[in-house]
């Protein structure tokens, strides 16, 4: 099991990311999700590519740019690296935003299962859910079919009809029209893998390492993680995740 994270495609992506840092607001390289939501939602930044939390924050009544923003699918690339042939291909590629709802569970050992389930049902009822998706910092995104009806946002939140339609259509088109996606990694060691790539990319963004050097470092760390956990263990867990995706 060899990491591919330091291949040409990923290096090119990190190179683009480093280049993009020239255009971030002051301190933007170190933004967390909350900072990004507040910056775009408050009208301090022009463009946000993330979950739709920042867009929703921009459309709240307390935002200076309410009804002055737009939604569009995430941009793609006009070429891709084919790792099988070892060559670049001039083919457009675009990966979508994945519409997904939060999930919750009650522990089997809980002494108050009925109360816990009752609370979850209350918390997730339609009225509360629709209130939650209207507040950017809550991180509750549309995922029910009823969430993609533009009139919901026009009538309840005072959104401009054209912007509401653009928002709902953008999310629904990516959800229904794209199969070019992979869900987040769900294997033993996932947090270690993520931490290694976060550390490496941070060094590239700070100018301490080139994109290639940074991802070479990440690949070396990933090899250590695989050796520590076991390739077969990771492979088996990954297969379970893929099977789940194939049945959605």
Q: Locations of the language-model features?
A:
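C-terminal lobe and pocket-closing loops
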Residues: 54-65, 77-199, 234-248
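Soluble non-cytosolic domains of exported or imported proteins
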Residues: 4-11, 31-34, 110-114, 187-195, ...
């Amino acid at each position: 099991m060899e990491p591919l994270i330091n291949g040409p495609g990923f290096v090119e992506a990190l190179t683009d990311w480093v280049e993009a840092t020239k255009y971030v607001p002051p301190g933007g390289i170190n933004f967390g999700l909350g900072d990004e939501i507040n910056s775009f939602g408050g009208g301090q930044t022009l463009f946000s590519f993330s979950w739709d939390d920042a867009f929703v924050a921009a459309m709240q009544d307390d935002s200076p740019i309410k009804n002055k923003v737009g939604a569009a699918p995430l941009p793609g690339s006009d070429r891709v690296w084919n790792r099988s042939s070892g060559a670049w291909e001039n083919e457009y590629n675009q990966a979508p935003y994945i519409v997904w709802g939060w999930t919750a569970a009650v522990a089997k050992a809980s002494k108050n299962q009925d109360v816990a389930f009752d609370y979850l049902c209350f918390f997730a009822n339609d009225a509360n859910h629709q209130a939650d998706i209207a507040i950017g910092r809550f991180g509750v995104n549309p995922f029910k079919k009823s969430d993609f009806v533009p009139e919901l946002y026009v009538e309840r939140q005072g959104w401009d009809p054209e912007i509401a339609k653009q928002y709902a259509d953008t999310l629904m088109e990516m959800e229904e029209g794209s199969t070019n996606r992979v869900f987040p990694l769900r294997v033993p060691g996932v947090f270690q893998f993520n931490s290694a790539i976060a550390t490496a990319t941070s060094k590239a963004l700070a100018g301490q390492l080139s994109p290639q050097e940074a991802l070479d470092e990440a690949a070396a760390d990933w090899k250590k993680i695989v050796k520590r956990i076991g390739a077969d263990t990771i492979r088996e867990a990954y297969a379970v995740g893929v099977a789940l995706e194939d049945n959605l």
